Amino acid sequence: MQDEERYMTLNVQSKKRSSAQTSQLTFKDYSVTLHWYKILLGISGTVNGILTLTLISLILLVSQGVLLKCQKGSCSNATQYEDTGDLKVNNGTRRNISNKDLCASRSADQTVLCQSEWLKYQGKCYWFSNEMKSWSDSYVYCLERKSHLLIIHDQLEMAFIQKNLRQLNYVWIGLNFTSLKMTWTWVDGSPIDSKIFFIKGPAKENSCAAIKESKIFSETCSSVFKWICQY
């Protein structure tokens, strides 16, 4: 009888030790798992932080690159007296017109919706005048409306312009002969591509460009024609 009681007592004690050891192992496993979870969580947070900083840096670099390109490129702070040679812009006031507005219009979002009465083509907006002005007055008119006289980049754009012109007379574009550079220059400061366009007429001081039937002609800048604004 005593042996039986001793056996039962030993059996109970053995079970208690086994249960305690199991509890200790389970708690230890949980502690290890929690430790690794904290490590992984820390690594994840660090990686996310690095990615966020990298993205912010890229955005800042792109923004600075666009700004520097705009500042150092054709959109300089030179006055329009330099770009238009000896032309007097807006006679009487002899106002100096900065090219900052041209720079702003070129860096604008290409997906912007065109204003009322403006036509959209290839991410740009076009306005066709019904009045007639000299080249310099036409230039000022466009600039005051946060745009510039038409700059034509290729024959497809020329075809679009001709399709929407409802008359066959001359129309001013943003191209003139500058005495300082002694060349035909667009209002954004870039030279004309002679491989794409040929200008009929003299290349001399006080000469501005007008289009008629898909051709570009040299005309006296004081002549009065209709014009096209673009942004």
Swiss-Prot record:
Location of the protein in the cell: Membrane
Disulfide bonds: C142-C229, C208-C221
Short name of any one Pfam family annotated for the protein: Lectin_C
Membrane disposition: Single-pass type II membrane protein
UniProt keywords, alphabetically: Disulfide bond, Glycoprotein, Immunity, Innate immunity, Lectin, Membrane, Phosphoprotein, Receptor, Signal-anchor, Transmembrane, Transmembrane helix
GO molecular function, one term: MHC class I receptor activity
Residue intervals of the C-type lectin domain: 121-230
Tissue localization of expression: Strongly expressed in peripheral blood leukocytes and spleen, with weaker expression in lymph node and adult liver, and no expression detected in bone marrow, thymus, and fetal liver. Not expressed in brain, heart, placenta, lung, kidney, skeletal muscle, and pancreas. Within peripheral blood leukocyte and immunocyte cell lines, expression was predominant in NK cells but was also detected in monocytes.
Chain positions found as Phosphotyrosine: Y7
GO biological processes: cell surface receptor signaling pathway; innate immune response; NK T cell activation
GO cellular component terms, semicolon-separated: membrane; plasma membrane
Domain of life: Eukaryota
InterPro entries on file: C-type_lectin-like (IPR001304), C-type_lectin-like/link_sf (IPR016186), C-type_Lectin_Receptor_IMM (IPR051379), CTDL_fold (IPR016187), NKR-like_CTLD (IPR033992)
Residue ranges that the UniProt entry lists as topological domain Extracellular: 60-231
KW Transmembrane (keyword) present: yes
Post-translational modification: Phosphorylated on Tyr-7; this phosphorylation is required for NKp80/KLRF1-mediated cytotoxicity.
Keyword Membrane: yes
Biological role: Functions as an activating receptor involved in immunosurveillance upon binding to various ligands displayed at the surface of myeloid cells. Upon interaction with CLEC2B ligand, stimulates NK-cell cytotoxicity and cytokine production leading to the cytolysis of malignant CLEC2B-expressing myeloid cells. Actviation of the common cytotoxicity pathway involves SRC and SYK kinases.
Complexes and interactors: Homodimer. Interacts with CLEC2B.
Protein name: Killer cell lectin-like receptor subfamily F member 1
Lineage: Eukaryota, Metazoa, Chordata, Craniata, Vertebrata
Recorded name of the encoding gene: KLRF1
